[in-house]
């Protein structure tokens, strides 16, 4: 079946390629003719990216306010609102564009590879380089890289990603396999018939999908807005009532009401998160950790339990012969040479390779082999016919119980088996001899050594408050031995314990890939934020179910497509780095959120308090200008230094509100003092007072930002250069506007300097209030390590 494939591509390309494959020259010629094997994804342009930032709950609030301001003919306010929208849209679009570009580069690094027969030899190449006529080899776990006609071998193909049908279909010689389908079982050679946009389903570009899950930050943002709007609504009622009592025209009140509500909208939050997450994503990529979406960085911050595959993550994924018990006349070397005769190097089986490597190190000559039967699940052994000193011998290699069924087990073997088995070794027995006279030759013990860096990295995860649970398909004795070696505490569960799993277990043995999904759900039901590592096709559901799905370095294409994080290096280091990056993003966003909550409460209470006595201490225009100025500075928090918390980070809106309100009340006293002194002691004109209050609110907002960014005294760490520069520019520009009376009544530079001094002194005094609020709320956990800047 060649639907959707140009006829010349089939009739000309496929037959000539045939089993012999193509040469590099032919492949280059066909690539220039048919194009690369990919479907280009249309990337949104800059304009479209900007417009996309103007659609959503936060932009809607501002857009409604803009329309209302315009309808009330408040032109300056409407222009500033429009400027807020456009500025945040452009900045968010710029950062999202950079993030898309970074993720596109990561997708190239995650590029699907294929085995292709070129220039007379099998070789690996990027799937996008395949051309019609290429001869490819696919096996279990692969994503089919192009439409192809099976030449030999049998496959079980999952086309659910293409057709939606979950039932696998069989494919054999003469049948077509389609690009984007998954090989569930078997292996086969096939001739490529179509590539790129000519494939039947045209899905090559989406073989590795970018995760597009919504960030939890969006939910948090809406919850915070709900709290603040509820507070605003109550205060607005007081404000309107008091204003009407003092005979203020309703037309003058309406703009104030709108601005009070706008003050609660976290306009710059999405842009700040994108900046913070993009910085960490790029840092992770430099260390070999690829994230498929920015939300993955945030999710890693809250992970408190990691289900880690034993093989390759905690161990070296390299079977090694560690001990032998030989009864062969030639000793250990003859035993290993006979065992090697029953191994097949072409399968790349790790056990076969370990025995072959051990045999080669002994220097014993290999035995000529006349026949070979590879390992089969039905017989649980492999066999070979060899020439042994001129005699035809049969050699069998398999589990001791299987070989014991073919030949008598010598006395004394059981003790050795029990001891090594209890230590977690994988043991194989070797039988050999003339047909009908097999003898027990000996035993070979193998183990997968623990990675050198595993204990230290497990210790680091423990410092970060992440408990590690080992998951393995090995037998319980092996799992217990490895858990002891790694220092993991707790019992080792078995497959039957998965349904009622808990964090008390140090690991689970005898687990099939299909059980991992149930394990993740069981732990999530107990309120755990779960990370799961995986590498196989059957790991995909568990990787998607886990909050933090991690595809390890050796993962199949399907596992990588299902994970939020993809490691390019073996071991746990990449996971540690992801957790640390997530914690830094959380700290930066916590700083932003606390500053926003505190500032909103301070502004609303200040305006409403004095409005009740008929004094409007600032104007709607100046409030909007203040929001604009504060957003400009607060977005640079995304680049700031951040300490790494010692425990999983979880958002608690009520505690955020509590800390924010505490800080707001402290700074509210400063604002009250400025208004009272200015209005009733110095007797400034109202316009001058409004400018002074505006400047005090802007300066105190910046001071509060520097306070909440540091969990200890605010002078404990140096802010990032971008934050200092943004603050300096903000103060300078607003100082110039105030001095020359642009958009506000002019004030003397002496007053501006005095306000800066007052705010600086208040920041030092109120830092004790901040420390008390953090301590009593419990919102901030202990930290580990130093600060890290973006």
Give names to the regions the model predicted:
Residues 2-9, 36-116, 122, 227, ...:
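Transmembrane helix-loop-helix hairpins at the membrane interface
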Residues 90-145, 151-152, 161-172, 275-299, ...:
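Juxtamembrane coupling segments of multi-pass membrane pumps/enzymes
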Residues 80-111, 118, 212-305, 461-464, ...:
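Hydrophobic alpha-helical transmembrane segments
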Residues 19-20, 30-42, 87-94, 98-109, ...:
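Actuator/coupling domain of P-type ATPases
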Residues 11, 80, 111-222, 426-429, ...:
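Cytosolic catalytic regions of P-type ion-transporting ATPases
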Residues 91, 121, 193-196, 208, ...:
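Conserved beta-strand/loop elements of the cytosolic catalytic core of P-type E1-E2 ATPases, chiefly
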């Amino acid at each position: 079946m060649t639907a959707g494939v140009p006829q010349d591509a089939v009739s000309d390309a496929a037959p000539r390629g045939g089993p012999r494959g193509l040469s590099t020259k032919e492949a280059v010629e066909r690539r220039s003719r048919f194009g690369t094997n990919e479907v280009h994804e249309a990337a949104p342009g800059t304009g479209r990216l900007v417009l996309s930032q103007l659609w959503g709950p936060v932009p809607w609030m501002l857009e409604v306010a803009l329309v209302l301001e315009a309808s009330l003919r408040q032109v300056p306010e409407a222009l500033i609102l429009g400027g807020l929208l456009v500025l945040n849209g452009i900045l968010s679009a710029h950062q999202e564009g950079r993030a898309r570009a970074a993720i596109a580069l990561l997708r190239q690094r995650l590029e699907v590879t294929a085995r292709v027969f070129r220039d007379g030899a099998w070789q690996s190449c990027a799937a996008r380089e395949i051309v019609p006529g290429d001869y490819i080899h696919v096996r279990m776990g692969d994503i089919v890289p192009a439409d192809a006609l099976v030449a030999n071998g049998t496959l079980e193909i999952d086309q659910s990603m293409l057709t939606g049908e979950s039932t696998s279909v069989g494919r054999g010689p003469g049948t077509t396999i389609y690009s984007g389908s998954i090989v569930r079982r078997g292996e086969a050679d096939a001739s490529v018939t179509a590539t790129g946009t000519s494939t039947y389903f045209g899905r090559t570009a989406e073989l590795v999908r970018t995760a597009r899950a919504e960030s939890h930050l969006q939910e948090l943002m809406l919850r915070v807005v709900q709290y603040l709007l509820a507070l605003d609504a109550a205060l607005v009622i007081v404000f309107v009532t008091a204003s009407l009592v003092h005979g203020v025209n309703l037309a003058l009140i309406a703009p104030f009401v709108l601005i009070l509500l706008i003050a609660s909208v976290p306009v710059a939050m999405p842009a700040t998160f994108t900046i913070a997450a993009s910085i960490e994503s790029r840092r992770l990529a430099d260390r070999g950790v690829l994230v498929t979406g920015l939300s993955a960085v945030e999710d890693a911050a809250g992970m408190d339990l990691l289900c880690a595959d034993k093989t390759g993550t905690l161990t070296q994924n390299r079977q090694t012969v560690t001990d032998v018990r030989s009864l062969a006349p030639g000793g250990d070397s003859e035993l290993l040479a006979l065992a090697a005769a029953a191994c097949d190097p072409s399968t790349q089986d790790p056990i076969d390779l370990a025995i072959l490597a051990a045999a080669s190190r002994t220097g014993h000559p290999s035995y000529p082999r006349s026949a070979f039967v590879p390992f089969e699940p039905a017989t649980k052994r492999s066999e070979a016919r060899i020439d042994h000193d001129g005699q035809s011998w049969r050699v069998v290699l398999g589990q001791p119980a299987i070989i014991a069924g073919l030949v008598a087990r010598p006395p004394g073997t059981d003790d050795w088996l029990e001891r090594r088995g209890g230590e977690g070794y994988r043991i194989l027995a070797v039988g050999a001899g003339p047909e009908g006279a097999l003898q027990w030759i000996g035993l070979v013990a193998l183990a997968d050594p623990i990675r050198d860096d595993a204990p230290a990295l497990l210790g680091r995860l423990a410092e970060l408050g992440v408990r590690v649970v080992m998951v393995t398909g090995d037998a319980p004795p092996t799992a217990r031995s490895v858990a002891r070696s790694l220092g993991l505490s707790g019992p080792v569960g078995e497959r039957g314990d998965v349904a009622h799993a808990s964090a008390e277990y140090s690991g689970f043995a005898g687990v099939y890939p299909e059980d991992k999904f149930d394990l993740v759900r069981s732990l999530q039901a107990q309120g755990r934020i779960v990370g799961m590592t995986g590498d196989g096709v059957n790991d995909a559901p568990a990787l998607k179910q886990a909050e933090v799905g991690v595809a390890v370095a050796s993962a199949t294409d399907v596992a990588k497509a299902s994970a939020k994080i993809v490691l390019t290096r073996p071991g746990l280091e990449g996971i540690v780095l992801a957790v640390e990056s997530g914690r830094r993003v959380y700290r930066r966003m916590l700083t932003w959120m606390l500053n926003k909550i505190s500032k909103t409460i301070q502004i609303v209470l200040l305006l409403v308090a004095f409005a009740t006595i008929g004094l409007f201490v600032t104007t709607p225009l100046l409030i909007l200008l203040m929001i604009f100025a504060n957003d400009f500075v607060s977005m640079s928090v995304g680049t700031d230094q951040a300490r790494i918390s010692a425990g999983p980070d979880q958002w608690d809106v009520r505690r955020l509100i509590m800390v924010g309100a505490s800080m707001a009340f402290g700074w509210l006293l400063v604002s009250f003092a400025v208004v009272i002194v200015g209005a009733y002691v110095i007797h400034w004109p109202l316009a001058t007072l409004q400018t002074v209050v505006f400047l005090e609110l802007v300066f105190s907002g910046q001071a509060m930002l520097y306070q909440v960014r540091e969990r200890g005294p605010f002078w404990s760490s140096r802010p990032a250069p971008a934050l200092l520069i943004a603050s300096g520019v903000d103060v300078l520009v607003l100082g110039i506007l105030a001095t020359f009376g642009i958009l506000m009544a002019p004030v003397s530079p002496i007053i501006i300097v005095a306000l800066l001094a007052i705010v600086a002194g208040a920041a030092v005094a109120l830092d004790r209030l901040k420390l008390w609020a953090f301590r009593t709320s419990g919102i901030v956990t202990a930290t580990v390590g130093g600060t890290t800047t973006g």
